[in-house]
Amino acid sequence: GILMLDEPFSALDAHLKSVLEQNLVSLFDAFHGTVLYVSHDIDEALRFCDRIAVVETGRITEMGTGDDLVNRPQSLAGVKLSGCKNATAAVRVDERSVRLPKWGIEAATSAAVPEDVKALGVRAFFLQRVDGPGENCYRVRVDRVSDSRFERTVLLGFLDRDESEAPTVSRTDDEMKYLHQHLFWRVDKLAVPADELPHEGEELWIRIPPNKVYLVSR
């Protein structure tokens, strides 16, 4: 048989959700059939599912294990649904570098760049604060910060971006374009002293590790 669940925890508070998730694990263990679980929450999908299918505009764009999706996404939809906060259009420059028009920068990559590369992704917690210029190091300004219990989410604007393909957009002109020109950086508040956390208006240097980017062609 087939058991189908469509976002069963979407309206629950965090405590109740965690309790019911454990009940659901017991149910799955006792059920001898196929479970079709629909979710927009990647962590939820990873906890419950052996294989994950990415669906975009009604079609499956990729399917694999949770590890495949998180560490080796094959499509832009997969990059985004895996929880990657930074995903942007990419143009191949050479075998080891790409141009990222919306960000107005070029970036080096450890992996070979496909001839038909479509996009680059980098997770917000992979970004590194550095002291100054270097490979994949960029001067940025902290344009916005927001705090959760244990993390600070930081919106970074590139200060020396190339505007030839995508002129800089202000927040008041077009909010979505403004956001797409920025990097999202997640800072662990438990690992960084409070007086060293990035704050709005601060200028600093950030590094995109070449070995931590995803390159996809669809």
Regions found by a protein language model. Give the residues of each.
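Secondary-structure boundary/capping residues
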Residues: 33-36, 87, 151
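Generic structural "secondary-structure junction" signal
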Residues: 11, 18, 83-84, 129
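Non-catalytic connector elements of ABC transporters
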Residues: 85, 96-218
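C-terminal boundary and immediately downstream tail of ABC-type ATPase nucleotide-binding domains
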Residues: 71-94, 121
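ABC ATPase nucleotide-binding domains
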Residues: 1-77
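Residues located in well-ordered beta-strands
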Residues: 65, 77, 91, 139-141
